[in-house]
A protein has these predicted regions:
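Intrinsically disordered, low-complexity linker/propeptide segments enriched in Ser/Thr/Gly/Pro
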Residues: 1-8, 19, 135, 164-169
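Per-ARNT-Sim (PAS) sensory domains and their PAS-associated C-terminal
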Residues: 1-5, 109-133
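PAS-associated C-terminal cap
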Residues: 22-33, 150-164
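Short, ordered coil/turn segments that flank beta-strands lining enzyme active or ligand-binding pockets
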Residues: 13, 53, 62, 128, ...
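PAS/LOV and related PAS-like sensory modules
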Residues: 32-62, 66, 161-169
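PAS-family sensory domains
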Residues: 1, 11-25, 46-116, 139-152
Length: 169
């Protein structure tokens, strides 16, 4: 009938036996749902990063590591990664530009201040390889922070081409 029972038996020195049966059907169903959610997050064509309230990485999907590998950024998205270390690695690469008049450390400070103050935000990020990313940042009720990054370079290039054609008319 789909019920999952956990059986636990303990034999005592006098030879008696204690048997405890626990219905863990709900736990098994939740486990299946969590695995399905994890699979969905791993297979969406966007980068998903989930950080705790102290800016330590809870999880990131494989797409995040793929992007860093493709760009030669020496930072792997592993549980516990500190946000500041990720930003420092990105800003040390040729793909992420430190704003004029700033240093890596002042840019890290600015980004940390942004993260502390933002509740929900949508923004575009332009990288030095001419790619454009649409970023959604959301502070959750428990203080954790969710960021979703979508590569919109093709869309932006088509918009430029349409504008160029429209201007030519």
């Amino acid at each position: 009938d789909g019920t999952t029972i956990l059986a636990n038996e303990t034999k005592f020195k006098d030879g008696s036996l204690l048997s405890v049966y626990t219905d863990i059907t709900d736990l098994k169903n939740q486990e299946i749902e969590l695995l399905r959610l994890k699979n969905a997050i791993e297979n969406v064509p966007v980068i998903v990063q989930y950080w705790d309230e102290n800016d330590n990485l809870i999880m990131a999907n494989n797409k995040a590591n793929e992007m860093h590998r493709e760009m030669g950024i020496k930072c792997e998205f592993v549980k516990g990664l500190f946000y500041e270390d990720m930003v420092r690695a990105q800003l040390s690469s040729p793909f992420f530009k430190v704003p004029d008049g700033e240093t890596i450390e002042t840019e890290i400070k600015r980004r940390k201040q942004y993260r502390k103050s933002v509740q929900s935000n949508y923004r575009e990020v332009f990288l030095e390889n001419d790619s454009t990313w649409y970023v959604i940042d959301k502070r959750l009720e428990d203080g954790s922070f969710l960021s979703i990054f979508s590569d919109i370079t093709e869309i932006k290039n088509k918009e430029k081409e349409h504008k160029r054609l429209a201007d030519a008319l």
